[in-house]
Amino acid sequence: MALSLQQKITDPNQGVYLIGTTPPKAGTAEDKTQRIAKKLLARLNEVEYDGLVVYDIQDESSRVSSERPFPFHATLDPREYSLLLRKLARRDVITYKSVAQRDAAEFRDWLGETARDYQLQNLVLVGSPSSNGTIKLSLADAYRELAEHPADVYLGGVAIAERHASKGNEHQRLIEKSAQGCQFFITQAVYNAQATIDLL
């Protein structure tokens, strides 16, 4: 019997290859969303991969003072796109969730909906892109809320090797996130191999 994505991630002898994608723009018609998903999966037809990652895109204009090269566009709910991709690809999906825009009660409702309506268990929670702007729920508070919630979640976190290169403390962040419930970590891309090696 094939191993689940959780089993592969948990087993240090298994390599895990994930493909990341973003949901289509908010307001995209259902039939067009289906076509986009099928086109993505057709491109991946010849690739051996273990699962898909669906990112939750947030407005990061508070992170930098200069104007972004591309304006922010809201996307469809990542849970909806995750559900569609899981159904079409018949592979496990990891769904990202940006937690800063909702307060604790809204986040608890979101967790309940995610378990009940979408049957999604593999989640990566991400915090605010910067300390500027409105933060309704911190990442640490979201981890606490999740720990007290009955939803069965396989929780992942984000590891940023470049942050380790500049601040030297990413390993401490990973240890803290592990203590807060993270069971695996994802690096979105390796821009600097040496920074990644140093972090590991």
Q: What is the predicted role of each segment?
A:
Residues 184-185, 193, 197-198:
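A long, hydrophobic alpha-helical segment
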